[in-house]
């Protein structure tokens, strides 16, 4: 009798496992793209609790999608392999323009800061103490630049540090490399690279994961404020999918457990956003292009004038949209 009961119990367990597997297989899948700001192993550990909650509360099977660079996530969205993603602003701009992406939410720093800042860092023992020092000694320095689709690692320093000073980093330095935020910071800490781009969020994260490393770094330049990172979904998701995702994101962070999950991601509750979040980033990209054209000695006068006129017209349109948005925001606040 006992043996028969054991066989029935075992068969029931196998059936339950089989049914659970079938139920899991029948769940609609949402692929969540995560940009490679640090090693995939570190990212998996901090994202897993959030994605698990997302699965439970939406009813979707949420799978993390990692790629070695930002372009991999953008391409994944372009070919419908990524449904929703956390991007920086520059990468989000590429996703909106080239991968039918649409911004629906914005991250908010756990500290409540309205955004974050791009940094240039050097080793604490370095004689390079300022942006001016770096530019004056560039020919003897190895420079760690960011991913070409990174806002704080590439676009922002590309304009404020290099374009405004008429400097091409590829030509100016002894050697230039492109890496993730974490790789750049560790390379500077270990004296493998002389100067590199980084950001304040990455610094806070490094203080948690490898607290001895930030002590080997010093900040030699800090950018103007960068808006918080956007969350982007494919604009061809169904209304049902968008409503479920929107409901999850804007309610998440209501209890202590969820707040802890967000805090581990260095965030507090999400806030609604849209593609207009990118207007300052688009302006920055156009400013950089305009500076590059103005300083391009290989362009003839007529061609240069035509390119500058076209860029100025684009900038004027952007400035008008930004002014209209500010007026609307002020009216809503009033």
Where are these regions (language model features)?
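Periplasmic-binding protein-like
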Residues: 31-36, 43, 109-119, 211-246, ...
């Amino acid at each position: 009798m006992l043996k028969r009961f054991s066989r029935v119990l075992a068969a029931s367990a196998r059936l339950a496992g089989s049914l659970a597997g079938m139920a899991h297989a029948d769940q609609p899948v949402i692929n969540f793209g995560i940009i490679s700001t640090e090693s995939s192993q570190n990212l998996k550990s901090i994202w897993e609790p959030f994605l698990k909650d997302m699965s439970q509360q939406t009813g979707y099977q949420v799978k993390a999608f990692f790629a070695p660079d930002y372009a991999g996530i953008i391409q994944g969205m372009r070919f419908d392999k990524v449904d929703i993603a956390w991007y920086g602003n520059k990468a989000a701009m590429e996703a909106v323009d080239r991968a039918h992406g649409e911004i629906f939410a914005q991250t908010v720093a756990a500290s409540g800061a309205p955004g974050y800042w791009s940094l240039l860092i050097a080793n604490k023992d370095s004689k390079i103490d300022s942006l001016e020092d770096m530019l004056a000694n560039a020919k003897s320095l190895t420079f760690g630049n960011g991913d070409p689709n990174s806002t704080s690692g590439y676009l922002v320093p590309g304009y404020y540090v290099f374009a405004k000073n008429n400097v091409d980093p590829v030509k100016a330095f002894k050697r230039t490399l492109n890496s993730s935020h974490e790789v750049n910071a560790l390379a500077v800490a270990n004296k493998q690279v002389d100067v590199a781009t980084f950001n304040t969020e990455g610094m806070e994260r490094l203080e948690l994961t490898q607290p001895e490393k930030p002590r080997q770094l010093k900040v030699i330049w800090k950018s103007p404020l960068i808006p918080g990172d956007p969350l982007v979904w494919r604009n061809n998701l169904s209304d049902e999918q968008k409503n479920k995702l929107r409901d999850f994101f804007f309610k998440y962070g209501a209890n202590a457990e969820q707040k802890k999950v967000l805090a581990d991601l260095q965030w507090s509750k999400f806030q609604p956003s849209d593609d207009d979040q990118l207007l300052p980033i688009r302006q920055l990209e156009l400013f950089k292009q305009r500076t590059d054209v103005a300083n391009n000695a290989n362009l003839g006068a007529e061609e240069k004038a035509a390119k500058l006129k076209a860029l100025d017209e684009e900038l004027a349109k952007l400035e008008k949209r930004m002014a209209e948005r500010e007026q609307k925001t002020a009216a809503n606040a009033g």
